[in-house]
């Protein structure tokens, strides 16, 4: 038999039956739990899809499935059986679940995916099954039992109300009135519930009291029915003394009862208004997340809570309370509070303490208790009056009962006494009302004055922070006085009026408010959270660090208060945009200054190239047969300084020249450090100090030097390139100086250096040209130049005396730059100082350490740099002895030259160092450019405020 024929031969059996043919199925609480909780949870699980339908053996190509599995089962079959009441008890349904899981384990291997999914479902099934009610009860049985009990009680009550027994009841009622007030729970309630409008009503209510005392086993419903069915025989069997009693009750009770009713309605309406407001607050949308379980009565059938009414005898919910409030069934606020607290107590009684509903009930009860505590209490005098009226009512009821047994004379005397007492009570009540009106007007005036003061001067409270404790103490005293004067009624009313009068916000205003709040700094957000928590009771206990605010749930008064505070904060920050404009203008000035420097450097470079072509001569170089000189450690800075000395006359207006040169000359620093931050005065300054040490060089970069070194880096690179090009050409005799620019004085030692520098600086020419043609390194910091200065000056230890130093100082006085550039540089330096100073110190110390190690390893290089440095600072106008000394030193240096191979190795090393340094600078520049895109506005605003304070 072929494979297709086998596949066609696989036929699925019919699904299991789900309709009980015997009709013996029942609906129990456990089966309801299995259907609504267990099956629903399993069906929603992500692993339940293979078990939701019967196994399709033909589709899955499982020919032996139904031969191995004799009783197939799936979730859909169980669901249909539960819906059609197939099961007689819950154990049958649990057996079907276990059959489904055992079929999976029987047919599949232990490691298969379907087995893992079945194990996960079985675990969930066992967890849900552990929550099932232990006792199985039929769901419809209780209702039938209740109906049977009610029918039996109705029949028994009807049998008791026969004409023969009704007469006995009438005689009993005639004997009881003397002791009746002791039987009633409160004469006030009886007086209110039973107005003496007709004879039958009074008699019926008296029968209620008698019935409750005589028969405690029967429920109140049956007694009420019996009393309602009994009036006709009662009317027939009235005795002769009954009308006398009713007349006395009529003549005495109406006045006192009416007076008490008027008083009670005034007080009740005042308090019940607040109670209705509390009920509206509890039913509001903002309390929905934790108040929704209490909106409606507990649905016992839907939730499967079949023992609920056994534990909770008096169920209560907010819907029932609202219905009673609408029907005006509450007489005072205490009854309303009792029902609300009963609702919460039922929740705490039935549910475990760690249940979610208990937490929600506690949150809602906090809201209720907080609002209920704000309800104004009744005054003490009025309470006493109420007690007096109740006592008088009790006395009246007792006296009326005694008068019913006595004659007409005693009843008339008691009536006169009652009238006198009632008159006194009315006088007392009038006096109390007058006192209350006077007391209520005084705090209202104080509150109006406070509101006017707060509206007139709201800013003084923010400025005078030290006065807050005094004001708080005064406010506390005023509050205590107000409490003693009983002003509690008016304050919550005023708050409610403010909340009602607050104009609600539309969508655009809420959106603008949220945007304005996002603009505020972090220190202002704490005040916003405080405002919201003080005005919103639902958010009072929330964490201020992780609070979530929904504008839709906030009150209109809270939103308006937030709007006022945000506008006040934004007015204070109105000067910030002006400061930002100033910063932008400075940045533009700085960029323009850089562009101008680059343009001038290009002009200087072109001029140097022209002069070099003019000064070319066919003279032979006398030093050509000698081996090339090894480049000493500081050749780049010396060449740069020399070229800049010759070019500084044409660029005398570069930024910050005067201030930097003067500061460097006064501090006695080296000439190379002054050259890096000077223009035209540095070519003739005698800036050689008696002793040069590497430690002193650590103090060289001052405030102005640091700034000007950064600004003059393009000048260094272009000048180095220009000097290299000039030195590669043929030179004349060593004593002859090259042709100079007009107005420029070049010292003799520089001329000698240029004559011998053609061989020394030849390897660096190509590198410097690449630097010139590449992008100008504008962001080069002061550290690199300081390191070169240290390398140049550290080895020098001999004293050099200069003749005519005063004349050279006068000749080298700095030319003052324009005030605009100077002021902008100083302002820029204040911004860059804090960021650069730490970096400069750390790198300088590291370079000093490296230089000392290098000088210790190569003593020859340090001696050569020392000699060259000593001979390089003698001016042209100095004596012939100094010139001769410099020429002698040059000749001695030429005699002590190393071999060409050593020179090439050293030059390669310096090239590698220079390239590494340039690479690090480029990486630093790119990192700063990347970081420049992210701007911390809070930090920028703080920097601007600090800058403005220092600038003023």
Curated annotation (Swiss-Prot):
- Which ranges belong to the motif Nuclear localization signal? 208-219
Q: Where in the cell is it found?
A: Nucleus
Which residues lie in Pro residues bias regions?
Answer: 625-638
List every stretch annotated Disordered. 141-168, 209-257, 392-420, 442-504, 607-746, 850-930
In the record, biological process GO terms are: chromatin remodeling; male meiosis I; male meiotic nuclear division; mRNA processing; positive regulation of gene expression; regulation of DNA-templated transcription; regulation of RNA splicing; RNA splicing
> Which Pfam family name is an example for this entry?
BET
Q: Which SUPFAM superfamilies match?
A: Bromodomain
Keyword terms of this UniProt record: Activator, Bromodomain, Chromatin regulator, Coiled coil, Differentiation, Meiosis, mRNA processing, mRNA splicing, Nucleus, Phosphoprotein, Repeat, Spermatogenesis, Transcription, Transcription regulation, Ubl conjugation
Select a single GO molecular function from the record's annotations and give it. Answer: histone reader activity
The question of whether Coiled coil is a record keyword is answered with: yes
Q: What is its main location?
A: nucleus
The Bromo domain covers: 26-132, 266-375
Point out the coiled-coil segments of this chain: 417-442, 837-936
A GO cellular component annotation here is: nucleus
What's its job? Testis-specific chromatin protein that specifically binds histone H4 acetylated at 'Lys-5' and 'Lys-8' (H4K5ac and H4K8ac, respectively) and plays a key role in spermatogenesis. Required in late pachytene spermatocytes: plays a role in meiotic and post-meiotic cells by binding to acetylated histones at the promoter of specific meiotic and post-meiotic genes, facilitating their activation at the appropriate time. In the post-meiotic phase of spermatogenesis, binds to hyperacetylated histones and participates in their general removal from DNA.
Q: How does it assemble?
A: Interacts with the acetylated N-terminus of histone H1, H2, H3 and H4. Interacts with P-TEFb components CDK9 and CCNT1/cyclin-T1. Interacts with mRNA splicing machinery proteins SRSF2, DDX5, HNRNPK and TARDBP. Interacts with SMARCE1.
| Entry protein name | Bromodomain testis-specific protein
Name of encoding gene: Brdt
């Amino acid at each position: 038999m072929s494979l297709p024929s086998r596949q066609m031969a696989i036929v699925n059996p019919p699904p299991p039956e789900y309709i009980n043919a015997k009709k013996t199925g029942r609906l129990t609480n456990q089966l309801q739990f299995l259907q609504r909780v267990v099956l629903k949870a399993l069906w929603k699980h992500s692993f339940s899809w293979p078990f939701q339908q019967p196994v399709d053996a033909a589709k899955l190509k499982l020919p032996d499935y139904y031969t191995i599995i004799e009783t197939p089962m799936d979730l859909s079959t169980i669901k249909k059986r539960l819906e059609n009441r197939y099961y007689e008890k819950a154990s049958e349904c649990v057996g079907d679940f276990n059959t489904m899981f055992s079929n999976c384990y029987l047919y599949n291997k232990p490691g298969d995916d379907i087995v893992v999914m079945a194990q996960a479902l079985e675990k969930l099934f066992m967890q849900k099954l552990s929550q099932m009610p232990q006792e199985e009860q039929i769901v419809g049985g209780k209702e039938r039992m209740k109906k049977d009990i009610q029918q039996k009680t109705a029949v028994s009550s009807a049998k008791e109300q026969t004409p023969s027994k009704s007469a006995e009841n009438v005689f009993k009622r005639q004997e009881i009135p003397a002791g009746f007030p002791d039987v009633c729970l409160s004469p006030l309630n009886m007086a209110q519930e039973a107005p003496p409008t007709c004879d039958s009503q009074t008699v019926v209510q008296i029968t209620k009291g008698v019935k409750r005392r005589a028969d405690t086993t029967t429920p109140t419903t049956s007694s009420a029915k019996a009393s309602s069915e009994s009036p006709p025989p009662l009317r027939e069997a009235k005795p002769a003394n009954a009308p006398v009693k009713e007349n006395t009750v009529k003549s005495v009770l109406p006045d006192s009862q009416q007076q008490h009713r008027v008083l009670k309605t005034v007080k009740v309406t005042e308090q019940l208004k607040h109670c209705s407001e509390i009920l509206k607050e509890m039913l509001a949308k903002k309390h929905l997340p934790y108040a929704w379980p209490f909106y409606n009565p507990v649905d016992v059938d839907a939730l499967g809570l079949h023992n609920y009414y056994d534990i909770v005898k008096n169920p209560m919910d907010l819907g029932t309370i609202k219905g009673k409030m609408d029907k005006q069934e509450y007489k005072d606020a205490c009854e309303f509070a009792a029902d609300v607290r009963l609702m919460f107590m039922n929740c705490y009684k039935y549910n475990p303490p760690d249940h979610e509903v208990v937490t929600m009930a506690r949150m809602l009860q906090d809201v209720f208790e907080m609002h209920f505590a704000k309800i104004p209490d009744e005054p003490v005098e009025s309470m006493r009056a109420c007690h007096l009226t109740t006592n008088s009512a009790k006395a009246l009821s007792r006296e009326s009962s005694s008068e019913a047994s006595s004659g007409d004379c005693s009843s008339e005397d008691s009536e006169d006494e009652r009238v006198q007492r009632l008159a006194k009570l009315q006088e007392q009540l009038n006096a109390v009302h007058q006192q209350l009106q006077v007391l209520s007007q005084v705090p209202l005036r104080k509150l109006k004055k406070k509101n006017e003061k707060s509206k007139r001067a709201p800013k003084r409270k923010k400025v005078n922070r030290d006065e807050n404790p005094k004001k708080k103490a005064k406010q506390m005293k005023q509050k205590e006085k107000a409490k003693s004067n009983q002003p509690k009624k008016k304050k919550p009313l005023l708050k409610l009026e403010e909340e009602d009068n607050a104009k609600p916000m539309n969508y655009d205003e809420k959106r603008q408010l949220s945007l304005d709040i996002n603009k505020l700094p972090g220190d202002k957000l704490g005040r916003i959270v405080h405002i919201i928590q003080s005005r919103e009771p639902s958010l009072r206990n929330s964490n201020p660090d992780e609070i979530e605010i929904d504008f839709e749930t906030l009150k209109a008064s809270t939103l308006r208060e937030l709007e006022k505070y945000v506008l006040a904060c934004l007015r204070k920050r109105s000067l910030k945009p002006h400061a930002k404009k100033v910063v932008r203008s400075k940045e533009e000035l700085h960029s323009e200054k850089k562009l101008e420097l680059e343009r001038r450097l290009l002009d200087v470079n072109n001029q140097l190239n022209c002069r070099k072509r003019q000064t070319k001569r066919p003279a032979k170089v006398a030093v050509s047969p000698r081996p090339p000189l090894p480049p000493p450690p500081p050749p780049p800075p010396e060449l740069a300084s020399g070229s800049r000395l010759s070019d500084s006359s044409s660029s005398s207006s570069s930024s910050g020249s005067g201030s930097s040169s003067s500061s460097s000359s006064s501090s006695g620093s080296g000439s190379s450090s002054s050259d890096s931050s000077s223009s035209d005065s540095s070519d003739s300054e005698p800036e050689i100090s008696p002793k040069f040490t590497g430690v002193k060089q650590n103090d060289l970069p001052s405030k102005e030097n640091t700034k000007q070194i950064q600004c003059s880096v393009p000048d260094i690179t272009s000048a180095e390139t220009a000097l290299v090009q000039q030195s590669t050409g043929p030179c004349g005799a060593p004593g002859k100086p090259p042709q100079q620019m007009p107005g420029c004085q070049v010292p003799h030692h520089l001329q000698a250096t240029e004559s011998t520098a053609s061989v020394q600086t030849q390897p660096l020419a190509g590198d410097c040209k690449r630097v010139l043609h590449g992008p100008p390194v504008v962001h080069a910091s002061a550290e690199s130049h300081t390191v070169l200065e240290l390398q140049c000056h550290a080895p020098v230890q001999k004293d050099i005396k200069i003749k005519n130093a005063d004349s050279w100082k006068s000749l080298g006085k700095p030319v003052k730059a324009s005030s605009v550039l100077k002021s902008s540089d100083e302002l820029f330096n204040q911004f860059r100082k804090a960021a650069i100073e730490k970096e400069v110190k750390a790198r300088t110390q590291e370079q000093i350490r490296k230089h000392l190690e290098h000088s210790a390893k190569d003593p020859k290089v340090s001696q050569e740099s020392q000699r060259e440095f000593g001979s390089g600072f003698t001016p042209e106008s100095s004596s012939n002895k100094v010139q001769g000394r410099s020429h002698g030193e040059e000749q001695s240096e030429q005699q002590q030259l190393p071999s060409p191979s050593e020179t090439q190795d050293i030059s390669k090393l310096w090239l590698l160092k220079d390239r590494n340094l340039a690479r690090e600078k480029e990486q630093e520049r790119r990192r700063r450019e990347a970081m420049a895109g992210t701007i911390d506005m809070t930090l920028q605003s703080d920097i601007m405020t600090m800058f403005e304070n220092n600038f003023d």
